[in-house]
Regions:
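Unchanged
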Residues: 21-44, 54-104, 130-131
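N-terminal strand-loop-strand
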Residues: 1-15, 42-43, 47
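Short acidic/polar capping segments at secondary-structure boundaries
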Residues: 6-7, 91-92, 123-125
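Charged phosphate-binding loop/patch that engages nucleotide di/tri-phosphates or the phosphate backbone
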Residues: 107-131
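A generic structural signal for short, non-catalytic loop/turn and secondary-structure boundary residues
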Residues: 9, 79-80, 111
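Short glycine-enriched, charge-decorated loop/helix-capping segments at active-site entrances
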Residues: 15-21
Length: 131
């Protein structure tokens, strides 16, 4: 997991490493590159396990592709993006997690679910649905 401090980031807490897709890059290539840049690990065979998305105030939509990988080489190293560490799965709920990490992880692990959708903002956050 990667910890992003509130002092240096728009959002903070423990979450998965991530990033953006560069021009001419496939989604799978971008996840391999981003994981290496942020953790020092080179992953193999990333598998798409879900999509997280929400509407933007401009009328567009922000889409996050969630991948998992079980094969990797290299040594875990933190980066300017945040501190990284291995965490036992049963200890994750005890961490200071980024917004909605637990329900996102549940969606990613559910064989019959593939989308975490923030429908619209509410007074106390978002109206959310998992498909």
């Amino acid at each position: 997991m990667q910890y992003r401090s509130p002092e240096n980031n728009r959002w903070s807490g423990y979450a998965f490493p991530g990033g953006h897709v560069e021009n001419g890059e496939a989604f799978a290539e971008s996840v391999i590159r981003e994981i290496y840049e942020e953790t020092g690990l080179t992953i193999q065979n990333p598998q798409l396990v879900g999509i997280k998305n929400w509407p933007l105030d401009t009328g567009g939509r922000y889409i996050v592709f969630c991948y998992k990988a079980t094969e990797f080489t290299g040594s875990l190293q933190s980066s300017e993006e945040g501190e990284v560490s291995w965490v036992q799965k049963d200890q994750i709920p005890n961490l200071e997690l980024a917004y909605d990490m637990l329900p996102l992880m549940e969606m990613m692990e559910a064989p019959d679910k593939s989308e975490f959708f923030y429908r619209h903002r509410t007074e106390d956050g978002w109206e959310k649905e998992i498909f």
